[in-house]
Amino acid sequence: NVSLNLLLGWDNELTYLIAPSARVPGKSYYSLNMTDSYARETFEALFCYITEKLGGNGYKHRVCNWVLGNEVNACNAWNYAGGMSTRDCAYNYAKAFQLLYQAVRGTDENARVFISLDHSWTVGQDGHSGKEYLDEFAAYMYATAPYMRWNVDYHPYSNPLYKNDF
């Protein structure tokens, strides 16, 4: 199985793709702009293109696990969102997730699409707690697209990171 993680970095010419509240250079990765129709259409076209090129049932070495973002609840460390509330951040992410899901499933009905969460389940050290974020994401998904089968890519690091005695 091949997995692919989709991340949005900074490019001065493409800042319209970044969520308006997150347009600050120098962050690791950025929250996608789902408030602007041109940005949404750009992501929709991009997702369709890459899923056609890299996914699909007809390829032996195809991408079958698609991950949108990295530890999206840690929106100060990874998917920078610029101070969005948990609900706004999760809903914005869910809208982007739905675009990717539709593109992926259009080329491969067996492929899986994942939300990526960090190890901070109850405390949001770098943004929002994983549980609260996932609850908001799930509520939006079930309200707007209950047929979508989504998956969780959970990063179970020790907390704190430097204390890994199990």
Identify what each model region corresponds to:
Residues 106, 136-166:
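Glycoside hydrolase catalytic-domain groove-lining segments
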